C-alpha cells in the first residue's frame, strides 16, 4: 500500500499542489490587473480612478467579483443553452492551461516539456473556439458578428506570430521554453539586435490576438454593442473577462520568454545574478502589461480593413523576409542551431 501511494498517488498530489500554486496567484493577478488598468488609465486622463472601496480602492476587484457572483445569470430564450454556458468556461480554462510550460525561474515550471513552443501555439489557436461558440450559441447578430471578427483577426495574426517564433527557434535551437531562455544567456549581441524588430512585431500581434486596443474590433461598442459577450451576464461575463486578462498576462510571459530573456537579469549583467530570477520575470511581465495599458489609454481603434491590411500585407511579408534573412545570416556565420 505504501509503495502504491509513493509511486502513483503522491506524484498526483504534488502536481495538484503545483496547479493550485499557479492558478490561485494568477486569478489574484488577473483581478488586480483590472484595478491597475483603471488606476493607470485614470492617471493618464488626469482623474483618480477607483478610490472608494478599501484603502486606495484596493478592494475594488473583490467588490466587482462579489457583484458579478450574485447577479442573476440570464440565458436568451432562443440560444443553445448548453453551448452558451460552455463557451466562457472553455475560454477561461484555455487561458489557464497555457501556463503549464511557462518557466517562472530556473527549474520552476509545471511541465518542462521539449515541445513547449508547440504546446503554447496549440493553446493559443484553440482559444478562438470559446469566442466562436459564444457568438453562435447566443443567437444574436451582434454576438455572431463579433465572433466572426475575432476568429478572422486571430487567424490573421497567428500566421505572423508563428513566423516570428520560427526566427527565435532558428537562433536558440530548441522548442523547450527553459532552453530558449538559457540560450539567450550566451547569445551574441548582434543576434539579439536582429531579433528586436521581430519582438516588436510579436508584441503587436499579441495585442491583436488578445483583442486589445487598438485591435479590439470584436468588442467595438459603437458598432457591435459589446461584441461576442453581449448576451452574457453574471459569472458567464466574469469568466470571459477573467479569460481576456489571463491571456494578457500569458502573452506577456511568452514575449518575456522569447525576447527579453525570461528570468535572466537585463542585458545578462552578471553582478545582478544575486537577485532571484522570479523577480526579473515578474518585473519584465509587469513592464509589458503596463505597455498594454498605456496603449489602451493613448491609441484609437483601427478600422477593420486597416487591421487586416496590417496583418496580411505588412506583417506576413515582413516576417517571411525576416525568416529568410535570419536563416541566411546564421548559415553564413555558422551560428545556425539544430532544432
From Swiss-Prot:
GO cellular component, one term: plasma membrane
Enzyme Commission no: 7.1.1.-
Keywords: Cell inner membrane, Cell membrane, Membrane, NAD, Quinone, Translocase, Transmembrane, Transmembrane helix, Ubiquinone
Topology versus the membrane: Multi-pass membrane protein
Residue stretches in coiled coil: none
One of the protein's GO biological processes: aerobic respiration
One GO MF term: NADH dehydrogenase activity
Pfam family, one: NADHdh
Superkingdom of this protein's organism: Bacteria
Compartment list: Cell inner membrane
Primary localization: membrane
Reaction it catalyzes: a quinone + NADH + 5 H(+)(in) = a quinol + NAD(+) + 4 H(+)(out)
Keyword DNA repair: no
Protein biosynthesis among keywords: no
Transmembrane parts of this sequence: 9-29, 50-70, 82-102, 115-135, 161-181, 187-207, 235-255, 275-295, 311-331
Subunit relationships: NDH-1 is composed of 14 different subunits. Subunits NuoA, H, J, K, L, M, N constitute the membrane sector of the complex.
Similarity comment: family membership: Belongs to the complex I subunit 1 family.
Primary role: NDH-1 shuttles electrons from NADH, via FMN and iron-sulfur (Fe-S) centers, to quinones in the respiratory chain. The immediate electron acceptor for the enzyme in this species is believed to be ubiquinone. Couples the redox reaction to proton translocation (for every two electrons transferred, four hydrogen ions are translocated across the cytoplasmic membrane), and thus conserves the redox energy in a proton gradient. This subunit may bind ubiquinone.
Annotated protein name in UniProt: NADH-quinone oxidoreductase subunit H
Gene responsible for this protein: nuoH
Amino acid at each position: 500500500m505504501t509503495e502504491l501511494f509513493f509511486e502513483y498517488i503522491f506524484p498526483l498530489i504534488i502536481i495538484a499542489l503545483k496547479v493550485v500554486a499557479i492558478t490561485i496567484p494568477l486569478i489574484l493577478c488577473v483581478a488586480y490587473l483590472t484595478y491597475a488598468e483603471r488606476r493607470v488609465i485614470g492617471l493618464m486622463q488626469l482623474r483618480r480612478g477607483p478610490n472608494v472601496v478599501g484603502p486606495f480602492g484596493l478592494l475594488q476587484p473583490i467588490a466587482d467579483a462579489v457583484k458579478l457572483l450574485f447577479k442573476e445569470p440570464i440565458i436568451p430564450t432562443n440560444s443553445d443553452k448548453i453551448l452558451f454556458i460552455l463557451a466562457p468556461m472553455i475560454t477561461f480554462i484555455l487561458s489557464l492551461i497555457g501556463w503549464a510550460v511557462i518557466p517562472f525561474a530556473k527549474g520552476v515550471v509545471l511541465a518542462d516539456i521539449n515541445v513547449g513552443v508547440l504546446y503554447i501555439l496549440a493553446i493559443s489557436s484553440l482559444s478562438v473556439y470559446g469566442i466562436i461558440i459564444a457568438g453562435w450559441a447566443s443567437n444574436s447578430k451582434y454576438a455572431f458578428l463579433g465572433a466572426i471578427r475575432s476568429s478572422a483577426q486571430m487567424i490573421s495574426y497567428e500566421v505572423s506570430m508563428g513566423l516570428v517564433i520560427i526566427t527565435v527557434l532558428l537562433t536558440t535551437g530548441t522548442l523547450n521554453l527553459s532552453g530558449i531562455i538559457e540560450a539567450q544567456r550566451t547569445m551574441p549581441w548582434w543576434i539579439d539586435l536582429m531579433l528586436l524588430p521581430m519582438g516588436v512585431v510579436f508584441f503587436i500581434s499579441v495585442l491583436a490576438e488578445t483583442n486589445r486596443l487598438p485591435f479590439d474590433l470584436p468588442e467595438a461598442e459603437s458598432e457591435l454593442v459589446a461584441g461576442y459577450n453581449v448576451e452574457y451576464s453574471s459569472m458567464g461575463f466574469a469568466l470571459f473577462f477573467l479569460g481576456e486578462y489571463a491571456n494578457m498576462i500569458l502573452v506577456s510571459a511568452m514575449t518575456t520568454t522569447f525576447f527579453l530573456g525570461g528570468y535572466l537579469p537585463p542585458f545578462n549583467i552578471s553582478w545582478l545574478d544575486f537577485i532571484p530570477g522570479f523577480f526579473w520575470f515578474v518585473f519584465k511581465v509587469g513592464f509589458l502589461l503596463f505597455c498594454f495599458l498605456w496603449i489602451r489609454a493613448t491609441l484609437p481603434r483601427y478600422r477593420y480593413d486597416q487591421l487586416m491590411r496590417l496583418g496580411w500585407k505588412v506583417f506576413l511579408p515582413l516576417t517571411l523576409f525576416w525568416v529568410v534573412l535570419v536563416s541566411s545570416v546564421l548559415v553564413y556565420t555558422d551560428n545556425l542551431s539544430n532544432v
